[in-house]
């Protein structure tokens, strides 16, 4: 491989780093610092740039990425999307000629995706080469000049922007690709009858020495359904899920079916698939990962779950050797095997192509039909429309709206996701 006339394999890494910047699919795997400001400037410091130059670049990068509220923060207290922003800023500050991005939008909210699009457009206007490996395609419409389709490690097709846009949604789906035009994803659909509700009381939480990030004094949310939880990065969605599942002690009560569930009780009732699934993969094989979640091991059922999620061929592989999307599906399989009555999924389709997103959606619907309550934190409009019956909208640590996915709900979703996105 050659970059700017130089063979990459023959160049020392520090030389390549001056020319090529990269953002990993899991941003945490490229962090070297605990606080956000130090992380952004780390690359420039590593390249030995003058202190004043680094300060000036930092100020510009913070403005370009609108990161004022994230400066000086503990990286481990950020949401997945906020970590992604810090990773992008840490690469941009070094001003490379070539930027390689692996699923940069996978954990970003609708507003942040528009910010990402603006950043890509800015880099493009500067004459930089930007290579984006993506499953989520709609935000690249009108921006990307070429679309290269890779399968089995080989380039199968090379489309111009016009050629790719001329494909029908059916043709793209056949290739396993996500939608390119969001408006095409908004058909009306039949909804199951509204079911029970859970009552929340005193769901308030703050990290040590930081402002309160969750403040729900009293509210009700649907039960026995697939509930999509939406909101911008940092709105409190992941914190809410941790508190609900009992992972944060002393946080709130849930009243359901006439019983009050305190945090300790909820540990045995809920199961959470985390946004960063590496935190909950423990065993030597994929099959063992599913079996360990069962009260009584049932290999036949475990293999059925893996087959439903297109993982049976990986049952003897080490979970950490899989791709990000495959790890995500392994964690989902473990959640299903646990037979808990309430399941939380934090971005379950990040990094998944169309085929595997549909498989996850179908499995979630099957689990719901078995009487399980599912809460799905997601920025994935395709997943919401495929399987969610209700939406809970978070903002600034509070629930600001709740609605069914009926015609009125679809209009709200349109306003949330499609505003600012190129349309037909």
Could you say what each language-model-derived stretch is?
Residues 53-70, 299-314:
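Conserved ABC ATPase "signature" region
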Residues 74-78, 82, 318-322, 326:
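Conserved ABC ATPase signature
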Residues 88-89, 332:
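Hydrophobic anchor residue at the start of the ABC signature
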Residues 99-102, 343-346:
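Catalytic Walker B motif of ABC-type/P-loop ATPase nucleotide-binding domains
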Residues 109, 353:
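ABC-family nucleotide-binding domains
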Residues 134-135, 378-379:
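H-loop/switch region of ABC-family ATPase nucleotide-binding domains
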Residues 154-177, 398-421:
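Conserved beta-strand-loop-alpha-helix hinge in the C-terminal portion
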